[in-house]
């Protein structure tokens, strides 16, 4: 097969994958790229979450963990009710919600992995101050999972990696030479700044 024919096939395949992977984000209806199967990402997130639970020290503050779980359950119910009322498919169907409180006073953070795996660090509790503040932080993190931002980001990463490999092939390996000469993934770095994290 000649080079031109090969590039046509690759180009058509990439366009097909991109078009097939386009969908709309829940609530905002914003177009987003989703070429990574959500179930795969959820399974990977669940495995990583288990490792985090083994590695990190969990807080023994049962009252605070119960508060986190209570806030989470209320949000789960609100999300479900919203999508039922709106007659929209619930993007959290299939989520296996779980909540942990990690004992790290220096870490002022919380996050929600794909599939509803949520962690709150004890350090952020000084900032949130009360149930309302904690609910605001948790709501923000859960919104990322509802909007499927991780799936979109992983899909962009795959597409970017494929494009970078294609550019390297077309340039006769020049991109790899630049990376070796500079000791860094030049395109990866530039794309991280300009494409993956534009704001």
Which positions does each model-derived feature cover?
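A Zn2+-metalloprotease active-site environment signal
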Residues: 2-199
